[in-house]
């Protein structure tokens, strides 16, 4: 095997060009076995094997700096830069992250995981090189799906001003996570159709030189093209036409499904663990499709992640023009929603918590200053959500809850969520965001009659004394568990409160608690700094009420164990009960 002997890029260069396809197959074989057991990003890596080999064959990493956009396609890169054991040995599968990481290797320059950043990051490396009078190639590798992001276009626009070595590899597989959306993809299609010869050329129009490689999975053709642009003295785009999922028939056939995979059977491609349980994504999709049938003004919006809202390909077709995918462009998604709302439409935008920071300016400026009645639903905004350092989901409360005019809600159950949607989609007074709870969806079958238009009215679900526990969203169940333990272990009958509202205080209820309570506990599924609990603590201020805030520390966690993090932050019922008893 060639792969077993590769400890760095210098070993790739020792292989004859006509033998490199053998190495490519070995890489795919290793990726296939690992993915079948461990899961991970599948299609992007299978499509980039030859390009990665060619990059390390031609360039001199790490002197020549390669920056991968998103970096979810960096598995072959890791295999060729001293980390092959993490893909060949099951015992070492967890030794590396799913994205580039400078702590792992000198061949990785940034910890990244979001789209459309590579060109700007690499341009910065090139600018610093020029200022220091150094040499070396700087290469940005970006997939066509990422070109729909504004930062990518901003980076391309700036790149032309460098007037020095800067190479941009556009990996064009005619796909984002799902299908591509937007006018620029018509130009990419035209360039593919004309073998890169079309007069209308996005990249040339931006002042960049341009090279087209039709056979983007032919390692010899790629090596030839990369040698042509190596040590170039001005910015150049190398547009390579690749096949997402290449080398595994099920992935080639169903590219969207195989963007990312869990463990599966190699022979059939079928998942080892069927996820048949109903979740918030499927509930959302069915709710919106039903509303669309009776109301043509309802619009579901996604920014390149349609399945976050349950909109698989068949559901998107069913929704027709009432479903909009703006591409990986969160800013546009929010501004579009505001425009739709102002003109009488009923926009719904679903987004992962990890991408909320990309929406902040538009939520603040385009939505909340204008008081546009949009509905924005936050998915996986929880310690139970994604656990890569680039995809954390517990920072949205401080971001969103402090924007004026926004009503930020936190349901604890499916029934509460649907009731909030019923109110939000029909009201025209406020912009509304809804933070879905983490973990398995809870459905208690209850009928929720609460009028959410009467803002900031909490609900007391258990009346007690001395101790009041306010459990927000995900942690409402934890509040009930802690109260139960206090009753069982110390005979304390605690008050339990479901606050519903992240953005406002029920001052009347909080004031009333002073009559027969001396301690208030807040629980939130997010970082404490600037969060929900601090607002409660500030309300009680100089009074005699003790306030204990429970949530997460402000830190970047990476590939963490949920139970360990909860325990470290005293977010277990046993620890909360113990803390309460220690101060009585």
Language-model segment annotations:
Residues 248-357, 362-372, 470-473:
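Non-catalytic terminal/interface segments that mediate subunit docking, oligomerization
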Residues 39-48, 67-72, 101-120, 142-146, ...:
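Active-site nucleophile and cofactor-binding loops and adjacent substrate-binding regions
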Residues 29-36, 95-111, 133-139, 312-327, ...:
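Glycine/charged-rich beta-loop-alpha catalytic/anionic-binding loops adjacent to active sites
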Residues 41-162, 298, 303, 312-313, ...:
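Cofactor-binding active-site loop characterized by glycine-rich and histidine/acidic residues
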Residues 263, 269-274, 385-387, 407, ...:
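Peripheral docking tails and interdomain loops at the edges
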Residues 73, 108-264, 270-277, 282, ...:
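Glycine-rich ThDP/TPP pyrophosphate-binding loop and its adjacent helix/strand module
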Residues 86-96, 161-175, 368-380:
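A glycine-rich helix N-cap at a beta->alpha junction
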Residues 1-79, 215:
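N-terminal amphipathic, basic-rich helices that act as targeting or association modules
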């Amino acid at each position: 095997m060639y792969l077993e002997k590769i400890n760095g890029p210098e070993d790739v260069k020792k292989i004859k060009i006509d033998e490199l396809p053998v190495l490519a197959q070995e890489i795919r074989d290793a990726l296939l076995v690992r993915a079948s057991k461990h899961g991970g990003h599948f299609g992007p890596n299978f499509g980039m094997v030859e390009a990665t080999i060619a990059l390390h064959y031609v360039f001199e990493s790490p002197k020549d700096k390669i920056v991968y956009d998103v970096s979810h396609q960096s598995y072959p890169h890791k295999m060729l830069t001293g980390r092959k054991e993490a893909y060949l040995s099951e015992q070492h599968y967890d030794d590396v992250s799913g994205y580039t990481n400078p702590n792992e290797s000198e061949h990785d320059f940034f910890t990244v995981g979001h789209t459309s950043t590579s060109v700007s990051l690499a341009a910065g490396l090139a600018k610093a090189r020029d200022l220091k009078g150094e040499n070396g190639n700087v290469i940005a590798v970006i997939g066509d799906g990422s070109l729909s992001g504004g930062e990518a276009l901003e980076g391309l626009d700036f790149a032309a001003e460098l007037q020095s070595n800067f190479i941009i590899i556009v990996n064009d597989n005619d796909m984002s996570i799902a299908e591509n959306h937007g006018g620029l993809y018509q130009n990419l299609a035209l360039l593919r159709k004309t073998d890169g010869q079309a007069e209308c050329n996005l990249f040339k129009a931006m002042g960049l030189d341009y090279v087209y490689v039709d056979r983007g999975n032919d390692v010899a053709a790629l090596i030839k093209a990369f040698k042509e642009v190596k040590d170039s003295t001005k910015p150049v785009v190398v547009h390579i036409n690749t096949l997402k999922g290449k080398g595994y028939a099920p992935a080639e056939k169903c590219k969207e499904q195989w963007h990312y995979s869990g463990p599966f059977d190699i022979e059939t491609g079928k998942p080892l663990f069927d996820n048949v349980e109903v979740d918030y994504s499927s509930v959302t999709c069915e709710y919106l499709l039903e509303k669309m049938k009776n109301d043509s003004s309802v619009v579901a919006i996604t920014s390149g992640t349609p399945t976050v809202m349950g909109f698989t390909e068949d559901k998107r077709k069913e929704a027709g023009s009432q479903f909009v995918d703006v591409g990986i462009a969160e800013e546009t998604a929010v501004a579009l929603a505001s425009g739709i709302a102002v003109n009488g439409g009923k926009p719904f935008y679903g987004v992962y918590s990890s991408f909320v920071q990309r929406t902040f300016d538009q939520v603040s400026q385009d939505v909340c200053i204008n008081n546009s009645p949009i509905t924005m639903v936050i998915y996986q905004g929880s310690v139970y959500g994604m656990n890569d350092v680039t995809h954390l989901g517990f920072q949205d409360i401080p971001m969103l809850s402090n924007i004026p005019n926004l009503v930020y809600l936190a349901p604890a159950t499916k029934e509460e969520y649907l009731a909030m949607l019923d109110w939000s989609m029909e009201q025209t007074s406020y912009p509304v965001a809804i933070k879905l709870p983490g973990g398995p969806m809870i459905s208690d079958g209850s009928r929720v009659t609460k009028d959410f238009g009467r803002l900031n009215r909490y609900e007391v679900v258990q009346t007690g004394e001395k101790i009041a526990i306010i459990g927000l969203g995900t942690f409402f169940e934890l509040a009930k568990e802690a109260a139960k333990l206090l009753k069982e272990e110390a005979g304390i009958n605690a008050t339990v409160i479901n606050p519903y509202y992240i953005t406002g205080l029920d001052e009347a209820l909080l004031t009333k608690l002073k009559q027969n309570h001396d301690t208030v506990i807040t629980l939130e599924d997010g970082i404490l700094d600037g969060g929900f609990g601090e607002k409660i603590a500030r309300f009680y201020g100089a009074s005699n009420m003790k306030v204990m805030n429970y949530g997460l520390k402000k830190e970047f966690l990476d590939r963490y164990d949920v139970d360990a993090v909860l325990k470290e932050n005293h977010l277990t019922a046993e620890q909360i009960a113990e803390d309460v008893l220690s101060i009585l």
